[in-house]
Amino acid sequence: MQDLAKPKIKIKSPAKINLHLEVIGKREDGFHELAMIMQNIDLSDYLEFEINNEGLIKLESDCNDLSLSDDNLIVKSANLLRKNSNINYGANIFLRKNIPIGAGLAGGSSNAAATLIGLNKLWNLDLDHGTLCSLASTLGSDIPFFINGGIQLCFGRGEILEKLDSNFEYGVILLKNPNVSVSTAETYKKYSNRFCDNHLNDRKMIENIRKNLRDNGLNKLNFDNQHLFIKNDLQLVVENENDSVKQALYLLSKLENCLTFSMSGSGPTCFALFKDIETAKKELTANSKFFKDKGYDSWVCTFLEKGITFI
């Protein structure tokens, strides 16, 4: 095996929020048909990659709550890329974790996509964008979004992407109770039991919903007389069963300059939007102690035009 040079590659791996999450129905393959708008935000993890010639994937992290073994999406992504490319190189990977775990912000999916992108460069594989997206879709439904990044329409399981052209500069405040997490699989199951009686087979309805989101999705997110529309079907389930989510949404709704508020993904993180990052920072400065006293961690961030980036 030929030795490669040992550069160190560093990558910024951002979180996402859902600006629209519509569950159209349950498919015959067991997955749910979705129509979503996902947006990267600048709450980010950081990954470092370095070649090792032992043929091993070695993952370390500053987060003690993460498994670092083969069930970690970073390790799965690295092993998939090695197998697909038929190479024997390994990698030493270090993850600096800032995105909370089990929060509805898809930190694990972002890290998986960052690993595919980072190791593609580190190992000089030169795989094209389409190949990386195909590999990503085998690992998780929302991982292809992070290969693309920015703001995207997401259809199917979340793997069918259409780039949106926007220049939103909203500020974001996030709230999450650090002692609460939500199972995405359980949330979808509960939603399906309540609202999806039969398997979905109406292709015309699916296409109509997709067209409506293409035509009107961005309009609903434009600031107009302090009214924005954000839809999250899963919030119907989680808010009723999780007091911390219900309270977080209430607290965000009472912020003076809040334009709108919602839960992200399957929760439990909730967020509020503000006209710009300066307004969001002022609101968080004024309320951070109050949020902490209520049991919430809080963050302020803004939208990103791009997703995963080399640094």
From Swiss-Prot:
The active site is at 16, 142. NCBIfam families: ispE. It comes from the Bacteria. It comes from Prochlorococcus marinus (strain MIT 9301). InterPro entries: GHMP_kinase_C_dom, GHMP_kinase_C_sf, GHMP_kinase_N_dom, IspE, Ribosomal_Su5_D2-typ_SF, Ribsml_uS5_D2-typ_fold_subgr. ATP binds at residues 100-110. SUPFAM superfamilies: GHMP Kinase, C-terminal domain (SSF55060), Ribosomal protein S5 domain 2-like (SSF54211). Pathway: Isoprenoid biosynthesis; isopentenyl diphosphate biosynthesis via DXP pathway; isopentenyl diphosphate from 1-deoxy-D-xylulose 5-phosphate: step 3/6. The gene is ispE. It is an enzyme of class 2 (transferase). Catalyzes the phosphorylation of the position 2 hydroxy group of 4-diphosphocytidyl-2C-methyl-D-erythritol. It holds the Pfam family GHMP_kinases_N. Belongs to the GHMP kinase family. IspE subfamily. Its EC number is 2.7.1.148. This is 4-diphosphocytidyl-2-C-methyl-D-erythritol kinase. It catalyses: 4-CDP-2-C-methyl-D-erythritol + ATP = 4-CDP-2-C-methyl-D-erythritol 2-phosphate + ADP + H(+). Keywords: ATP-binding, Isoprene biosynthesis, Kinase, Nucleotide-binding, Transferase. GO terms for biological process: isopentenyl diphosphate biosynthetic process, methylerythritol 4-phosphate pathway; terpenoid biosynthetic process. One of its GO terms (molecular function) is ATP binding.
